[in-house]
A protein has these predicted regions:
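Extracellular glycan-modifying ectodomains
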Residues: 1-276
Length: 276
């Protein structure tokens, strides 16, 4: 009797999700995974292979099950590392512990070339923006930021002034699910730059525009139980009236194109994202 109950329950479960799968409209994009989902395959030699991908992508309540998996892994089994993404205090971190010396040298060579070619007798400043791993207290592999800073400081042209920004930021300055910093947290950074560069102080934008949900680049790589972020972009009359020229698309655009909030990466709201 017990085996029959288990068998019937399993069959009922499969039938229920088959019916739900037929009734639900297919999704084109997963914003949580930041990718296009498989569509129903055409009838050809690859039909059954593509059908497997389609059924997996269009499974009912897929996002909810991913969230349950993330909760089970992170909370129940205490697994903080997955696909090189580390979870701590509701933040996701991309672990990267190696400094690419060749890349640093290449950067320094480019800076020296630009300095010698285009910036003669100009005031030049350099800042290294730390990623949010710098503010991660846990003992996990991460960049030797002191060594990286030393490599840059000791090899930059002597006429370039270094502006240290590390103490103007904190972990709270970054998104939970993404590598980027939050625009609304950057006033201390702006004030430091203005002070060191002898620029006139300006009013920091105060009009907050919010968009939710924002699933960052790191969220797409792991099944996480962490809640989505809220993107906040700041405006004032000057920003609203300003335009920018997109050299890649060869067109004039507003500072914020709200249509980009509906992109797979909503962070594209900031100067058209990677296109700019």
């Amino acid at each position: 009797m017990k085996n029959k109950i288990i068998t019937y329950s399993f069959i009922s479960f499969l039938l229920l999700f088959m019916i739900l799968g037929i009734g639900f409209k297919d999704k084109e994009i997963s914003y949580q995974e930041r990718r296009k989902l498989a569509a129903f395959p055409e009838a050809n030699s690859s039909f059954f292979t593509n059908l497997d991908s389609y059924l997996s992508d269009q499974f009912p309540f897929r996002d909810s099950f991913r969230k349950i998996k993330g909760y089970t892994s992170n909370i129940v089994f205490r697994q903080k590392l997955s696909h090189n993404v580390f979870t701590s205090d509701n933040y996701l971190f991309q672990l990267d512990s190696s400094i690419n010396d060749k890349s640093v040298t290449h950067l320094l060579d480019k800076i020296k070339y630009i300095d010698d070619t285009y910036l003669t007798n100009q005031n030049i400043y350099f800042s290294m923006i730390p990623d949010k791993n710098y503010y991660l207290d846990e003992q996990v592999p991460k960049l030797d930021y002191n060594r990286l800073e030393s490599l840059l400081k000791n090899n930059l042209p002597s006429n370039i002034d270094w502006i240290d920004l590390k103490d103007t930021l904190s972990l709270d300055s970054y998104y939970y699910t993404d590598i980027h910093w939050k625009q609304e947290k950057l006033e201390p950074v702006v004030r430091r730059l203005q002070n060191k560069m002898n620029l006139a102080s300006t009013n920091f934008p105060t009009v907050k525009n919010e968009y939710y949900p924002f699933y960052g680049a790191l969220y797409s790589r792991v099944a996480s139980s962490i809640n989505a972020d809220t993107i906040t972009y700041l405006t004032n009359p000057s920003i609203s009236d300003a335009v920018v020229y997109n050299y890649e698309k060869k067109e004039i655009q507003p500072v914020y194109n709200k249509n980009y909030l509906n992109n797979v990466d909503s962070y594209d709201i900031f100067l058209s994202g990677a296109d700019f």
